[in-house]
Amino acid sequence: MVDIRKSLFFIIFFIFYNYVNSQKAINSDAFCQKKTITSICDPYLFNTDSIYIFNSTTTQESIELEIKRLLGFFSMLPSTCQVPSTYRLICNQYFQTCVPISKTDNSSTIAIPLRPCRESCDYGNGICGTQSITPCTGTFTEPTIYKFPVTSNVFDLSSLGGPSNYDLQCLNIDTMKAGNLNGTYISNNETVIVNQTCVYPLVYRNSTNREDDIKKGYQYLTETSDCLLPCPVPFFTENEWYQFKDLTTVTGVISFVCIFFNIFIYGFLNKKHDRHTIGILCLSFSLWCCMLSDLIVASSPDYSLVCPEPGRFARIHDSRCVANGIIFQWGAVCTTMFWSAMAIDLYLVIKKLSLPAFTVKYFVAAIFTLALLFTTVPLAWDDYGYGFGGVGCWIMSNSVQNGCFWIPMLICLLIGAVSICLIIYEIVKVFKNVGRSGISIILANARLFGIVSFIFIEYIYLFVYHFWVQENTEKFTQNITDWVICVQTTGSSDGCPLPKAVPYATQFIFLFFLRLLGIEVCIFYGINSRSKNIILESDLVNNKYFKAIRSKISSVGATSTTKNNTSTNNTSDQFNTSMFSVEVSKNGGDDDDL
């Protein structure tokens, strides 16, 4: 839940009490005025025939604007707050009834405001949950005049030519009575001001079980609000969100096919497994699982996988989301670990060191076991779901995500970094000790060193990206809060800038790098001389059916070659004969000349 409760209550406090505090207890510039505009408060006002205007710069229109600003936040407050008594309190605090008091010489009148009673203020705080930040006990500079009187305020108007001890009873919001004062209020005219809706793109939900809704992934603005955040959160425009999804779908499918090519060669066609081929196969299978999770994302034309309903973020109860998260998590952990294993393997190759076969098997089993552990822990804690970013489901909480992925990744990065440094050291040593004759050793492993280094750079980017986002999470959350307040205040999202979060290009690169891994592994491990030899030595190429096809192709090629040779020979004979004739002719001519 994005809890904007504190910010929301602060805004309400600021608007409501700033208006109250902007008035003086007694203002010589104040005057009474008949209600001249149509207001949403009309049915709730005690007396529309006499409205208190506390200075010359204040108008009924400006008061109405302040009321609308305040009521714009009420859809985010509990439904218990959205009742007639609350509207009576607010409306009569803004459009206060004006009580004219005649001066002692009857030359003119002094305008003083009729204020709601403290009991009404306390009751409004109680049903709205604002009692901790909107006190009802304040006074003006005159300590005997209360902003919300207990029963009445006593005014000393002698400085303005009026009575020195005028007692004005407060307005009881429940009974809409104020001593012996008469008003225009009619109870059956009251209507609900705030409709049970939320400003688009916020989503309204009338909850019957809020706790259960939160578990299902409904993101309420506050603990008591009926408004939900839209899913996905508008950190980006709708078009940009779909660009991310298209990127994931296209590159994910391409990477899926590329990785399957590796699996087919090293898993199905390969007859002779060694440490190197087992490493490639395991790395490829791990990446294939990651890309399989992308196919689950691609299976939905929209964001329904992660946003099953408006305002609901997918959670552990959504089977497709959980499958997407589990498959990706297992594949991602395995990929990271096998990458570090491949870095170690490359160092061993350059050093010409070998490991016993059983060591490799135990190593692979250990990686799969650890990956399974890091995958089941979030499942046990119901932590798979969709957060505020990305296009698919994964681990939601930072603590679990760090413990089950990013910290293991950091360890793998350190292992990989040490291996890369050792490899570079060995390369330098070969150049120094062997000279140019050692270049062949380096060139033979250049592709492998390239892929290990490329993946290392990409992992560093992903690692830094994650912790940068994590470090700025509170800032991004505050940006959401500011955006919500803007939307509710203005009544539209058109004039409100999107909440700032991760830059578009940064997010795009992050998503792209995750899918680029599969294509890179295919290029570096799947397209080389070893994979070619595996294909040529496989049963696929050497079975009787393929041999028959190959022999036919060969016979067709041989026939074509024979014809070409015959044609070439004939052409050569003709050419030679012609040349011979020329030579004879030339020789004959010479004889004649002789």
Swiss-Prot record:
The chain crosses the membrane at residues 249-269, 278-298, 330-350, 362-382, 404-424, 449-469, 508-528. It is found in: Membrane. Residues 1-22 form the signal peptide. Disulfide bonds join 32-98, 41-91, 117-170. Residues 270-277, 351-361, 425-448, 529-594 are cytoplasmic. Keywords: Disulfide bond, Glycoprotein, Membrane, Receptor, Signal, Transmembrane, Transmembrane helix. Residues 27-173 form the FZ domain. GO terms for cellular component: membrane. Glycans are attached at residues 55, 106, 182, 189, 195, 206, 479. It is a multi-pass membrane protein. Residues 23-248, 299-329, 383-403, 470-507 are extracellular. Its main location: membrane. Belongs to the G-protein coupled receptor Fz/Smo family. This is Frizzled and smoothened-like protein A.
